Amino acid sequence: MSKTSPYTSAFTACSFLYAEFNAVLPLLRSDNADVLLKEEVVNRNYLKVNNETSANRILHEFRRRYKSVPQDFWDWYDSLEEAAQKAALLYVIIKTYKLIFDFHVHVAIKKWNSVDHTITTEDLQLELLDVSANDEFVDSWSDQTKK
């Protein structure tokens, strides 16, 4: 099976992690980001995880998020209060991960525009089934990944 899918389950590796992302953001913005991020994988000064493999996976996803928006976004982001930063980080996540975008558009917005504003696990599972029916890569995910 060729990996031509726009989807990834990588979001599950580090979820939202607002505080951790903010702690690492200066490293991402640095001119020597590669060196600093490698040091963070080894020392884990900001990421409180047990091993280098987990730290590496999280930092890989943080880098993807960081690169998904223009550089001047991060200047604006730094000027925001915490609540606005969390909303801005949600925007970055929606922009980075197509599955999260689809959940937002096909589940959250649909619920927002309906009488029932509650999003259930079943709502998300139904959307994932729809995606899975049309994407061989997503369909190949284990049941554990799909949870």
What is each residue range found by the language model?
Residues 1-90:
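Eukaryotic partner-binding/assembly regions in large regulatory complexes
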Residues 14, 94, 143:
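Conserved phosphate/pyrophosphate-binding and hydrolysis machinery centered on Walker-type P-loop NTPases
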Residues 50-54, 142-147:
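Short amphipathic alpha-helical interaction segments
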Residues 65-68, 106, 110, 130-134:
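Amphipathic alpha-helical interaction surfaces
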Residues 71-74, 112-117, 134-138:
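Short, solvent-exposed secondary-structure capping/transition elements
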Residues 87-91, 95-118:
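Positively charged, polyanion-binding regions of nucleic-acid-associated proteins
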Residues 120-134:
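DNA-recognition alpha helix
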Residues 130-146:
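Short, positively charged loop/turn segments that connect secondary-structure elements
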